[in-house]
């Protein structure tokens, strides 16, 4: 597998006014590969943004090296780096009435002459970038008139206009609703695969990262940085350990976080399909430990359907009560 970017015993952090060094993380050895979507995840304050800025060449490392192909990243001229690495930051860009097309055209700056004139070839790249992200119809609209999801697509198009081998995005879904978050993640996954690009993004959306990433970089507070398949890091307990917090736990079986509640004891649940899934979630929210398909529990919920209608039976040692809605079940057991 080819490598487009690699770190070698990298140390990241800051030098404050007195030139004293504040190391955030050290001994980092990671790689990025063409065609892969890599997600960097971890709690706030772990150093994700510092790592992203260092890998993008925006911040010098405290020690070690970042190599871009065979070259050391931080020794290359900025114009040369810009032809290989494109960055989309979290900060909202305020550009007045600049059109989406004009913003994307700024991505051609590393290729234009000193007057910034666009050749026909540059114009074609800009149009193609907008088309690729599904934003061609937004070209003439001012950026200030776009929704957050539309704006993010345009920002990604601007990065694509640089024709980079590597795309680095700092929390690209931070201000988006759920459908737009899914849309942007699917877009980035496609851009990596079909464009043979290495894409690295940081995110707090663990569920989407687990579903969409080819590889995870897991950065807990204090390190170390761990790399692996999403499923592998879930199975070996690294995800649960990294996000361990009082009152919250990561459920390896469901691949999601669960809020720890005062226990109500075990409860049996039998049934299939969506009704069983959402009934289990409602019971767990109340604090029950749900045991599937068990006949030995003192309290059981049996789900049955007939003629398209769902019925819930709450079975106790001396009673069997039928309910027509999940609301009634939860009110009875709550």
Pin down the residues of each PLM region.
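Conserved catalytic motifs of ABC-family nucleotide-binding domains
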Residues: 163
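Catalytic Walker B motif of ABC-type/P-loop ATPase nucleotide-binding domains
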Residues: 167-171
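Conserved ABC ATPase signature
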Residues: 142-146, 150
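Conserved ABC ATPase "signature" region
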Residues: 120-138
């Amino acid at each position: 597998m080819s490598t487009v970017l690699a770190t070698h015993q990298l140390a990241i952090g800051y030098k404050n006014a007195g030139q004293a060094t504040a190391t955030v993380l050290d001994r980092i050895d990671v790689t990025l590969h063409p065609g892969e979507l890599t997600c960097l995840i971890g709690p706030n304050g772990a150093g994700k943004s510092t790592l992203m800025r260092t890998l993008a060449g925006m911040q010098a490392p405290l020690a070690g090296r970042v190599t871009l192909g065979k070259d050391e990243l931080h020794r290359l001229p900025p114009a040369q780096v810009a032809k290989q690495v494109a960055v989309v930051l979290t900060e909202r860009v305020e550009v007045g009435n600049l059109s989406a097309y004009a913003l994307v055209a700024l991505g051609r700056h590393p290729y234009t002459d000193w007057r910034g004139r666009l050749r026909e070839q540059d114009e074609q790249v800009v149009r193609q970038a907008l088309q690729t992200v599904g934003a061609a119809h937004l070209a003439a609209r001012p950026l200030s008139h776009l929704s957050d999801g539309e704006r993010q697509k345009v920002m990604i198009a601007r990065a694509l206009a640089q024709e980079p081998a590597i795309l680095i995005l700092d929390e690209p879904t931070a201000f988006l609703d759920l459908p737009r978050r899914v849309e942007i993640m699917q877009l980035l996954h496609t851009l990596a695969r079909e464009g043979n690009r290495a894409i690295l993004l940081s995110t707090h959306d663990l569920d989407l990262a687990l579903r969409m990433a080819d590889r995870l970089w897991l950065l807990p507070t204090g390190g170390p940085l761990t790399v692996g398949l999403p499923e592998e890091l879930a199975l070996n307990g690294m995800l649960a350990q990294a996000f361990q917090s009082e009152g919250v736990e990561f459920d390896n079986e469901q691949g999601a976080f669960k809020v720890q509640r005062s226990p109500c004891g075990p409860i049996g649940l039998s049934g299939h399909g969506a009704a069983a899934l959402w009934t289990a979630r409602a019971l767990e929210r109340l604090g029950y430990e749900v045991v599937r398909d068990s006949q030995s529990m003192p309290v059981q919920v049996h789900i049955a359907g007939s003629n398209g209608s769902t019925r819930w039976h709450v079975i106790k040692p001396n009673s069997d009560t039928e309910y027509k809605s999940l609301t009634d079940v939860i009110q009875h057991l709550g």
